[in-house]
C-alpha cells in the first residue's frame, strides 16, 4: 500500500470514534464528517505549490506565499461525498467543484455511473476526489476513470475509512493516485461493507434507511 497515507491525529481518532457509534444522529454525523475532511485536507494538500507574492504589512513590505486555488478542483462522489466537499472548501474557497454520481449495484457490487458534471480539466489541475468509504474500490476506480477521460492528470483520493481490498484495487489500477484516509479498517464482509466501518455513510448522513 505504497500510495496510502493514514492521517494519524488524536482529533481525527476522537471524531471518527463518535461517527462509528450507531447512536450518533445525522446532524452530528454530518458535522463530524465535514470536520474530519478539513483535517485530512491539511495533509492531502501538503504537496501543493506556493508562489511568492509581495505583501505590505502595517510595518513594511515582505515576501509571502499564496496557493493558486483556482487550479484546484474538488470532486465529491454523490451522495456522501457532498458533505466532504464542504470541509475542503473551507480551506480552498476558490476551488472549482465537479460532481460524479456513482452507485454500487448491491447484487454485482459493480459501479454504475448516473451523473457527471466537471469543470475543464488539464495537466495543471490538482483534483481532489472525495468519497467517505473506500470499500471494494470500484466506485473510486470508476470515478478516477471518468476524471482521466476528461483530462485530469493529478488526482488525490481522500476518504474517511478504507478497507485493504479497496486500497489495493485502486493502487493496482492507478499507481499515480495518492490516497489519504482517516483509518484503514480490517476487511470487507460478504456484502462489500467495511468491517468494523460505520455502516452506510450515505444512509446515515441523509437518514434514508
Curated annotation (Swiss-Prot):
Broad EC category: transferase
Catalytic activity, EC: 2.4.2.9
Metabolic or biological pathway: Pyrimidine metabolism; UMP biosynthesis via salvage pathway; UMP from uracil: step 1/1
Family matches, as NCBIfam families: PRK00129.1, upp
Residues bound to 5-phospho-alpha-D-ribose 1-diphosphate: 79, 104, 131-139, 200
PANTHER family assigned to the protein according to its UniProt record, in alphabetical order: ADENINE PHOSPHORIBOSYLTRANSFERASE, URACIL PHOSPHORIBOSYLTRANSFERASE, CHLOROPLASTIC
Example GO BP: uracil salvage
Name listed for the protein in its UniProt record: Uracil phosphoribosyltransferase
Molecular functions per Gene Ontology: GTP binding; magnesium ion binding; uracil phosphoribosyltransferase activity
Origin superkingdom: Bacteria
Keywords: Allosteric enzyme, Glycosyltransferase, GTP-binding, Magnesium, Nucleotide-binding, Transferase
Family under the similarity heading: Belongs to the UPRTase family.
Catalyzed chemical reaction(s): UMP + diphosphate = 5-phospho-alpha-D-ribose 1-diphosphate + uracil
Annotated positions binding uracil: 194, 199-201
Cofactor: record remark: Binds 1 Mg(2+) ion per subunit. The magnesium is bound as Mg-PRPP.
Recorded GO CC terms: cytoplasm
Amino acid at each position: 500500500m505504497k500510495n496510502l497515507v493514514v492521517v494519524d491525529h488524536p482529533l481525527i481518532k476522537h471524531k471518527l470514534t463518535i461517527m462509528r457509534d450507531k447512536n450518533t444522529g445525522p446532524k452530528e454525523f454530518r458535522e463530524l464528517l465535514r470536520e474530519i475532511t478539513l483535517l485530512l485536507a491539511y495533509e492531502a494538500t501538503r504537496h501543493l505549490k506556493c508562489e511568492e507574492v509581495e505583501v505590505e504589512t502595517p510595518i513594511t513590505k515582505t515576501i509571502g506565499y499564496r496557493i493558486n486555488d483556482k487550479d484546484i478542483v474538488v470532486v465529491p462522489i454523490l451522495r456522501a461525498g457532498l458533505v466532504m466537499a464542504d470541509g475542503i472548501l473551507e480551506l480552498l474557497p476558490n476551488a472549482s467543484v465537479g460532481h460524479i454520481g456513482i452507485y454500487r449495484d448491491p447484487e454485482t457490487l459493480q459501479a454504475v455511473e448516473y451523473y457527471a458534471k466537471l469543470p475543464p480539466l488539464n495537466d495543471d489541475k490538482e483534483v481532489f476526489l472525495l468519497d467517505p468509504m473506500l470499500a471494494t474500490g470500484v466506485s473510486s476506480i470508476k470515478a478516477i476513470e471518468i476524471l482521466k477521460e476528461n483530462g485530469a492528470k493529478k488526482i488525490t483520493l481522500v476518504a474517511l475509512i478504507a478497507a485493504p481490498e479497496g486500497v489495493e484495487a485502486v493502487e493496482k489500477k492507478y499507481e499515480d493516485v495518492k490516497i489519504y484516509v482517516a483509518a484503514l479498517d480490517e476487511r470487507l464482509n460478504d456484502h462489500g461493507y467495511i468491517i468494523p466501518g460505520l455502516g452506510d455513510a450515505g444512509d446515515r448522513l441523509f437518514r434514508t434507511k
